[in-house]
């Protein structure tokens, strides 16, 4: 197999829903990170062979968001670009597709990543074109419908997390402790400047001034498990408990401890946020690295995907990570750092149990519960965060990034530091 390298990567700071990035189009955010990633990689735009970029909420964003990103970033018209739509896995899927393009001999340098402005997702009238003659009409929230709603069981992603709670026996207290730890780690990392190297500033208008947005704004100070313990459950418990063994064999550890089985345990505090942001990754072949004298951050040594019952979509990373590690020829004991996207504390805990994570290596600077989850960008964002953290830790040689995907899927990638 050809050698595959991440030459450089970066991300925006993550904005809150309706926050600092609400008026910055997804394509604009994407262009900013692509331009900066190419600059850091010392790759001329004309040497890019293709751009592939994740974006889920594309309604009213204009044709092919990835092409907009490419042109706005100064990449020549002659370079093709396409938008990847694999729900939360879109940003990571773009990296997998970039790797495949290089392995196939179609490309030597590709730009991958993802962008999402959840704040800008429009409301839609589904019958206005042909049937809205008179009377009140319903508007559909495309942010929920296209990004956060299980199309197969007709309920919110939060209910899939409640399904996992019941099957894996995860308590409300466990989830609140997990969420509080994420917030505390993210606060410490942000305030100490741990994220500074991976973030590129985005100019935003505040009143009449243009200021640089470069600090993750969704992170909450002072969160403890006790401080969020009284929040009410946010999502209905699923009408039925699916059998996790239908597609794959899971250990389902802890199920015997389901003291609060059937109760609502997923809250606004132990679930990820609704957010805006973008991330970009420059991927190159070994030949391109040698030809242009590039200095890569890491080698991509394996990736994996997988599917599970949509009712328990949050455990998709278990299957994907096993496949990725098998392809890379490593075990979990070989992995020094893990970035596992925190869609919900429930699924994060289940994934950690099934994969036997050493939690001291997982999301060491917090995860999506604290930082936020701009859905089309998150798969790329966790790669950016993982690789930059590996650079700061001499002992970190190998890293795993993985995330769950609505509809019952997962993706994962394994890197080795250069």
List the model feature ranges, each with a label.
Residues 160-162, 206, 301-370:
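Active-site pocket-lining segment
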Residues 10-12, 22-32, 40, 174-286, ...:
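N-terminal extracellular/periplasmic Venus flytrap/periplasmic-binding protein-like
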Residues 46-54, 80-85, 110-115, 176-181, ...:
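Beta-strand segments within the central parallel beta-sheet cores of soluble alpha/beta enzyme folds
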Residues 12-38, 57-59, 82-99, 119, ...:
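Active-site pocket-shaping loop/turn-to-helix segments
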Residues 109-164:
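Flexible glycine-/small-residue-enriched beta->alpha junction loops
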Residues 24, 55-110, 152-159, 222, ...:
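Conserved catalytic cysteine-centered active-site region
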Residues 1-61, 65-73, 77-80, 160-172, ...:
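Conserved active-site "lid/cap" helical segment
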